[in-house]
UniProtKB/Swiss-Prot annotation:
This is Hydroxyproline-rich systemin B. Residues 19-35, 54-142, 161-164 form a propeptide. Keywords: Glycoprotein, Hormone, Hydroxylation, Plant defense, Secreted, Signal. O-glycosylated; contains pentose side chains. Expressed in leaves. Residues 32-71, 140-164 are annotated as: Disordered. Glycans are attached at P42, P43, P45, P49, P50, P149, P150, P152. The keyword Secreted applies. It is found in: Secreted. Activates a lipid-based signal transduction pathway in which linolenic acid is converted to jasmonic acid, a potent activator of defense gene transcription, including proteinase inhibitors. It comes from Nicotiana tabacum. It comes from the Eukaryota. Coiled coil: none annotated. The modification 4-hydroxyproline is found at P42, P43, P45, P49, P50, P149, P150, P152.
Amino acid sequence: MRALFLIYLILSPFRAVSRTLLENHEGLNVGSGYGRGTNLPPPSPASSPPSKEVSNSVSPTRTDEKTSENTELVMTTIAQGENSNQLFPFLTSSDNYQLASFKKLSISYLLPVSYVWKLISSSSFNHDLVDIFDTSSDEKYWNRKPLSPPSPKPADGHRPLQSY
């Protein structure tokens, strides 16, 4: 029971990972904005940061400053993602997306499960995990003689009390 609970605890975060991978594969959650898909049109020029071609007499508005900050945030996020891709070059394989997602899930799922399984099998409660095909332990259990009740012995050298 404890082993099943540990496996459930390990698997629960990866349901969201697999759901996200599926959405990204279908193009539902791809984009630089929060939940912005690939099917949406690009942002309008009014919301983009002011270009250098605009005269310097026009001061940028407050929304333009926020947009440029958001753009910088997105660019730093993309740069961080590229750095992680350099660490694990096989995670982003454009020619075979399913293989890349399988490798990513195997690293994030199979390694922790095998580690926890080693802990369970080497721990002190491995007697709970009985081999179902091992009949020798069953024979020892069912063929065991019942314990006989303890024989009445005198306590501390005194005679046992007799019932009248």
